[in-house]
Amino acid sequence: MNLHEYQAKDLLESYGLKVQKGIVAHNPNEAAQAFDQLGGKFAVVKAQVHAGGRGKAGGVKVVKSSQEAREVAESLIGTNLVTFQTDAEGQPVNSVGVFEDVYPVTRELYLGAVVDRSSRKVTFMASTEGGVDIEEVAHNTPEKILKVEVDPLVGLQPFQAREVAFKLGLEGKQINDFVKTMLGAYKAFVECDFALFEINPLAVRENGEIVCVDGKINLDSNALYRHPKLLALRDKSQENAKELKASEHELNYVALEGNIGCMVNGAGLAMATMDIIQLYGGKPANFLDVGGGATKERVIEAFKLILDDENVKAVLINIFGGIVRCDMIAEAIIEAVKEVNVTVPVVVRLEGNNAEKGAKILADSGLTLIPADGLADAADKVVKSLG
């Protein structure tokens, strides 16, 4: 689950980080009032969306008066902001953040952390190249990115943060401020179950103060049950409508741009199914994992979700029966096909627990379903069904 910038800054500030002061505004008048409240000569109005690249897309503007703040907010709120990280529709702008102007600054740094699956540790990354696309820095000049793996038994130690500060070229009070920032960020990361966080840029002001000018936080969705206050910050308007609907039925769904709908149980098998569709010349329209303990109701909802996509011209159902029984899946498929007006070819491959029984149920149903004897056969048939 992603947080908006203003939410991320509020959370980081509660852990002792110095952040760029700001006020969220949901309409132009609130934006004008926010400018006056901040009391500076300048302010920065930022569209609050769950996407990067806002500046290049026109979602970040410097304003010099409350009237300008009102006008910028009016031009952004109620629109969709399209950036390089969004789809063609963009993300809806329901609010803007009006932030104090911290510039000029002497330096812009980068600080971020992720759960590194290869090392199975929280890994911090820092760089002198802040304020730019960190992916480009990692690709073009990887030597400019410092990495620190944190031992989960002892946590991030002050000496590790100091070492990073030295390598970033910080000096004097800046070192202590950076150590406080990094330690606070780690504490927030662990206590709030972050999956990812970024401060880009982490600015060094002319007075030596270190300030978080931006903030990006992604929370581990599997841990949200123990963070009700953070869950209350969820902005469903920023989420893909189909993916949101899928999550309500405990389905793992990711929309893609192909025309072959996929319904599979198990994430690994789902990825293998998409790969083999591609191998046979097709294009998957989605990733959809109904889970190892799929119920009949969940399968029906999954089928509806796939067919809601107008781009889907054929469907491949690939089920390996382990915990889930193939005969139950077969009954759910029949019920779903009858409930939804299916006008596209449906290829079904069943293996494992009660597969023969499931195949017989489908064969006796009288529906025009296409049976497959293996994964390769299923991929071949679904691609050929497109004509």
UniProtKB/Swiss-Prot annotation:
Keyword Cell membrane (UniProt): no
Keyword set, alphabetical order: ATP-binding, Ligase, Magnesium, Metal-binding, Nucleotide-binding, Tricarboxylic acid cycle
A Gene Ontology biological process term: tricarboxylic acid cycle
Known pathway: Carbohydrate metabolism; tricarboxylic acid cycle; succinate from succinyl-CoA (ligase route): step 1/1
Obligatory cofactor(s): Mg(2+)
Entry binding sites for Mg(2+): 200, 214
Note accompanying the cofactor annotation: Binds 1 Mg(2+) ion per subunit.
Binding site for substrate: 265, 322-324
Residue span(s) of domain ATP-grasp: 9-245
Cellular component, GO annotation: cytosol; succinate-CoA ligase complex
Reactions this protein catalyses: succinate + ATP + CoA = succinyl-CoA + ADP + phosphate; GTP + succinate + CoA = succinyl-CoA + GDP + phosphate
Protein residues bound to ATP: 46, 53-55, 100, 103, 108
Transmembrane segments: none
GO molecular function: ATP binding; magnesium ion binding; succinate-CoA ligase (ADP-forming) activity; succinate-CoA ligase (GDP-forming) activity
Enzyme Commission identifier(s): 6.2.1.5
Family: Belongs to the succinate/malate CoA ligase beta subunit family.
Job of this protein: Succinyl-CoA synthetase functions in the citric acid cycle (TCA), coupling the hydrolysis of succinyl-CoA to the synthesis of either ATP or GTP and thus represents the only step of substrate-level phosphorylation in the TCA. The beta subunit provides nucleotide specificity of the enzyme and binds the substrate succinate, while the binding sites for coenzyme A and phosphate are found in the alpha subunit.
Known partners and oligomeric status: Heterotetramer of two alpha and two beta subunits.
Protein name: Succinate--CoA ligase [ADP-forming] subunit beta
Organism, as annotated: Francisella philomiragia subsp. philomiragia (strain ATCC 25017 / CCUG 19701 / FSC 153 / O#319-036)
